Amino acid sequence: MKLDLKILDARMRDYLPAYATTGSAGLDLRACLDAPVTLQPGETTLVPTGLAIHLADPGYAALILPRSGLGHKHGIVLGNLVGLIDSDYQGQLMVSTWNRGQTEFVLNPFERLAQLVIVPVVQAQFNIVDEFTESDRGEGGFGSTGRH
């Protein structure tokens, strides 16, 4: 799949999104910063990537997801948990960055911050009904199938 990528900050030409390994599902996104940013515990900031994409095809969307090492080792996760990039969005990719850890975290310019995953999308249409055809599960939810 080929995507249209617009470089909004010329410095990002050296830091294009890339798969870290041949089996990677996510493309690494980097922080397009002029100087280091310090996030205090509990603080959230919006970090630019210096890049924009246009998927164009409504059969696809992109997800911005956290990098597992930053979350596990430093408590750095996404403030909105998952960023959803619609196929018709053409603005800069931004990363809502939240320090849920107990210590301050310094984010350096061009550091890998998040990952971008392209996913297929089905746009559903609704069929209005008065009743559902009964299933084995019915309305059971929130633990109704047990833990083991």
From Swiss-Prot:
Keyword Hydrolase: yes
Cofactor(s) for this UniProt protein: Mg(2+)
Keyword Nuclease attached: no
Reaction(s) this enzyme catalyzes, per UniProt: dUTP + H2O = dUMP + diphosphate + H(+)
Gene symbol of the encoding locus: dut
Pathway membership, UniProt: Pyrimidine metabolism; dUMP biosynthesis; dUMP from dCTP (dUTP route): step 2/2
GO biological-process terms attached to the record: dUMP biosynthetic process; dUTP catabolic process
Biological role: This enzyme is involved in nucleotide metabolism: it produces dUMP, the immediate precursor of thymidine nucleotides and it decreases the intracellular concentration of dUTP so that uracil cannot be incorporated into DNA.
Name this polypeptide is given: Deoxyuridine 5'-triphosphate nucleotidohydrolase
Pfam families linked to this entry: dUTPase (PF00692)
